[in-house]
From Swiss-Prot:
A number of inactive tetrameric holoenzymes are produced by the combination of homo- or heterodimers of the different regulatory subunits associated with two catalytic subunits. cAMP causes the dissociation of the inactive holoenzyme into a dimer of regulatory subunits bound to four cAMP and two free monomeric catalytic subunits. Activates cAMP-sensitive PKAI and PKAII holoenzymes by interacting with regulatory subunit (R) of PKA, PRKAR1A/PKR1 and PRKAR2A/PKR2, respectively. Interacts with NFKB1, NFKB2 and NFKBIA in platelets; these interactions are disrupted by thrombin and collagen. Ubiquitously expressed in mammalian tissues. The modification Phosphotyrosine is found at Y331. Signal peptide: none annotated. Autophosphorylated. Phosphorylation is enhanced by vitamin K(2). Phosphorylated on threonine and serine residues. Phosphorylation on Thr-198 is required for full activity. Phosphorylated at Tyr-331 by activated receptor tyrosine kinases EGFR and PDGFR; this increases catalytic efficiency. It is a lipid-anchor. Its main location: cytoplasm. This is cAMP-dependent protein kinase catalytic subunit alpha. Allosterically activated by various compounds, including ATP. Activated by cAMP; the nucleotide acts as a dynamic and allosteric activator by coupling the two lobes of apo PKA, enhancing the enzyme dynamics synchronously and priming it for catalysis. The gene is PRKACA. ATP binds at residues 50-58, 73, 122-128, 169-172. The modification Phosphothreonine is found at T49, T196, T198. It is an enzyme of class 2 (transferase).
């Protein structure tokens, strides 16, 4: 690297530091004093279910006053308690209301009633990366790199706030109208200064240290980034099998095989991210995220332009207008029932 290039890199890294310091100030204000009860169910017209989960569903809704469409996550308090997800749910809302980054889905309102918790988020009509990836088969390396760069920046932001995301997978990445990523589902995100021990995540994406019940840190997100980049570029994840236990055996073995079409730069980056040895895993070394940002596979990436959303996206989802749900699957509809008695009031008092 020439002197001029090195100086440019140095000043870029300095301005990133300043940016993150300011971002942390903004985050901490909201983290310490979370917004509560900023809307009411009656203000929204419920249109269609966009997805379902073990303790709730996500619905497309329309704010009657403004006519804006949103995605409303509805969680059944009793089911959350039964599935021991109180802490995770409180974390999700507290984190989402405090963060602010171009590739994180925005929480617009949150509230609760006798039966449910509600998180009303920006509606991202392009649907999940998962469905586009399955339809197309696999993404070209430049296409995969465009998405990967956004995740790198997002993790750099989250980690600077002591947040671990812990649930990276194509199902949690929505594609917006400009073709950029919106990370959704902060159900497993957690603010951790040191290490944490909870077993959570999706089998194919779990880092070896989580499987081995070791204390783990932010490095699990960089491992998951390796899994995601592999899956985007190959069309299938690096470790897969019929049963989770077989997947776990492959993950901890430290052996990865690459398709022959992977470039040598891509393979090199993935070997450094899918690195079982934490003392060698990129993102976890003394240069932190810069080992990833300065890697040859990202040589053509203009990080600032990606952050500013100035790079032309490789793919724009089809979109027929506000409230279009054609990029989402159909689900059986169900009435939202609200009890006349308050359920689990104590458990969710801080929501």
């Amino acid at each position: 690297m020439g002197n001029a290039a090195a100086a440019k890199k140095g000043s870029e890294q300095e301005s990133v530091k300043e940016f993150l310091a300011k971002a942390k100030e903004d985050f901490l204000k909201k983290w310490e004093n979370p917004a509560q009860n900023t809307a009411h169910l009656d203000q929204f017209e419920r249109i269609k279910t966009l997805g379902t989960g073990s303790f709730g569903r996500v619905m497309l809704v329309k704010h009657m006053e403004t006519g804006n469409h949103y995605a409303m996550k509805i969680l059944d308090k009793q089911k959350v308690v039964k599935l021991k997800q109180i802490e995770h749910t409180l974390n999700e809302k507290r984190i989402l209301q405090a963060v602010n980054f171009p590739f994180l889905v925005k929480l617009e309102f949150s509230f609760k009633d006798n039966s449910n918790l509600y998180m009303v988020m920006e509606y991202v009509p392009g649907g999940e990366m998962f469905s586009h990836l399955r339809r197309i088969g696999r993404f070209s390396e430049p296409h995969a790199r465009f998405y990967a760069a956004q995740i790198v920046l997002t993790f750099e932001y989250l980690h600077s706030l002591d947040l671990i995301y812990r649930d990276l997978k194509p199902e949690n990445l929505l594609i917006d109208q400009q073709g950029y990523i919106q990370v959704t589902d902060f159900g497993f995100a957690k603010r951790v200064k040191g290490r944490t021990w909870t077993l959570c995540g999706t089998p194919e994406y779990l880092a070896p240290e989580i499987i081995l019940s070791k204390g783990y840190n932010k490095a699990v997100d960089w491992w998951a980034l390796g899994v995601l980049i592999y899956e985007m570029a190959a069309g299938y994840p690096p470790f897969f099998a019929d049963q989770p236990i077989q997947i776990y055996e492959k993950i901890v073995s430290g052996k990865v095989r690459f398709p022959s079409h992977f470039s040598s730069d891509l393979k090199d980056l993935l070997r450094n991210l899918l690195q079982v040895d934490l003392t060698k895993r990129f993102g976890n070394l003394k240069n932190g995220v810069n080992d990833i940002k300065n890697h040859k596979w990202f040589a053509t990436t203009d990080w600032i332009a990606i952050y500013q959303r100035k790079v032309e996206a490789p793919f724009i989802p089809k979109f027929k207008g506000p409230g279009d749900t054609s990029n989402f699957d159909d689900y059986e509809e169900e009435e939202i029932r609200v009890s006349i008695n308050e359920k689990c009031g104590k458990e969710f008092s801080e929501f």
